[in-house]
Design a protein with these regions (language model features):
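Conserved alpha-helix/loop element of class I SAM-dependent methyltransferases that forms part
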Residues: 32-49
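Class I SAM-dependent methyltransferase SAM/SAH-binding core
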Residues: 59-93, 97
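A conserved beta-strand element that flanks and buttresses the S-adenosyl-L-methionine
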Residues: 113
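Short alpha-helix
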Residues: 161-176
Length: 243
């Protein structure tokens, strides 16, 4: 299965039951709306009214609140037809339906953003090369390996590629980007996110349990049961690269 098929098998209506009306599909933390909190954390790195290219924009949750709260001009890129249609039909912001490996922006952006989407890239160096002439700031919220215990089956099920931090930094240094900010989140965000997913997955009817929804439930239970090992092996960090 390819990434586009993986994200096209479940409708936004089903996803709202699991991740809320803003359709933030990522890890969260804090009090109240934990998924929104995770996006708000990024505001400190993005000036108001910035132009933002949201790479792997999902159903537009991040771009929607950046536009609403910060007055940003957001353009999204997604490989998913379902996600692209949802963003366009709801007039959230301009969206490009494309594989990032085949996409080269035709304008300059203040920020390029990857929120838990960099891990889906098969050739991250190619994608970074494609966008590197269009921005001087790239922000990642991304998973990374902390040990050599690679959870291959879990990662493969999610069509992910997880690198060590030094590998990620090397992708950027080859294009003259320097790491200017790094913060770890997984040790305080994994547990509340898993509990949030599991609680909401109970609202999904059996007929609505697509392959993606089934995988999320299995994964959430796996993460809950193996939390200590996961946190030893995998991190989730905000990384800001600039030049």
């Amino acid at each position: 299965m390819e990434v586009d098929e993986f994200y096209d098998d479940t409708s936004p209506e089903i996803w709202r039951k699991v991740i809320g009306n803003d359709l933030h599909y990522h890890v969260g933390w804090g009090d109240g709306d934990i998924l929104y909190n995770a996006v708000k954390h990024l505001y400190q790195f993005i000036d108001k009214k910035s132009s933002v290219l949201d790479c792997g924009c999902g159903w537009g949750g991040t771009g929607k609140v950046l536009k609403r709260d910060m007055g940003c001009e957001v353009t999204g890129v997604t490989i998913s037809q379902v996600q692209s249609d949802y963003i366009s039909d709801n007039n959230l912001f301009p969206v490009v339906l494309s594989d990032l490996h085949d996409y080269t922006p035709d304008t300059i952006y203040d920020v390029c953003l990857f929120v838990e989407s960099f891990c889906h890239l098969k050739l991250p160096q190619k994608v970074l090369s494609n966008i590197s002439n269009s921005t001087n700031k790239i922000i990642l919220r991304e998973y990374h390996m902390k040990s050599n215990e690679h959870p291959k089956k879990y990662v493969d099920n999610w069509l992910m590629n997880i690198y060590h931090l030094d590998e990620i930094c090397s992708f950027f240094s080859k294009l003259d980007f320097k790491l200017t900010y790094e913060e770890e989140h997984y040790y305080y965000s994994l547990e509340p996110t898993v509990e949030y997913w599991l609680q909401n997955l109970d609202k999904v009817d059996s007929i609505e349990r697509t392959k993606h929804i089934q995988l999320l439930e299995l994964s959430a239970r796996y993460l809950k049961q193996n939390k200590d090992q996961i946190l030893r092996d995998i991190g989730l960090a905000t990384l800001v690269f600039e030049r």
